Regions:
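Surface beta-strand/loop "capping" patches
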Residues: 153-164
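Substrate-binding/catalytic cleft of secreted carbohydrate-active enzymes
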Residues: 1-142, 151
Length: 164
């Protein structure tokens, strides 16, 4: 429908790895929590290999990566709700705030330092009903100290390798 109104606007066919049609943007959701594994999933883009192809080889109907701009539209999802057993996030929850910050900054840096990643979006900004993986609480109050928030800001505002 978008193309009917503006044929110049790039479109994502299906968000999150499952591209079934001709696409203009290769959109990926990736909730890997191990920073080095995460970094490795994007280490061979110059050879035409993107993480979803490495981990989802059995899905033959999914369109392969063909050189389109790569947008990691969902990553992170790190659970932080130390006072609650309710809710969830991806992977094992960090045991300390410092571990959360290291993981957040590491995952973010892995994308920003990759010259083939054109964009990324941390999921998610706020906690929602069942998901306790936001940077802020459900009521929009900060979960983290100003010092930790500054670490997040610096990680997100680093110059991206694709800008060079």
């Amino acid at each position: 429908m978008t193309k009917l109104y503006d044929s110049t606007r790039p479109c994502i066919d299906t968000s999150g790895n499952y591209h079934l049609a001709q696409k203009e943007i290769h959109d990926v959701h990736d909730y890997e929590q191990n920073v080095e594994l995460f970094r490795g999933y994007y280490a061979h883009i110059d050879e035409g290999i993107v993480n979803c192809q490495v981990r989802r080889r059995h899905e033959e109907d999914v369109q392969p990566y063909c050189g389109e701009p790569i947008f990691v539209s969902e990553y992170g999802g790190i659970k932080w709700a130390p006072d609650s057993e309710k809710g969830w996030g991806y992977g094992n929850a960090p045991k300390t705030i410092e571990e959360f910050a290291d993981r957040y900054c590491g995952l973010t840096s892995a994308l920003i330092e990759n010259p083939y990643i054109t964009g990324a979006c941390y999921t998610q900004l706020y906690d929602v009903e069942q998901e306790q993986n936001g940077i802020y609480n459900y009521d929009r109050t900060p979960k983290f100290s100003p010092e930790i928030q500054e670490r997040f800001r610096l990680a997100m505002q680093a110059k991206a390798a694709i800008e060079n």
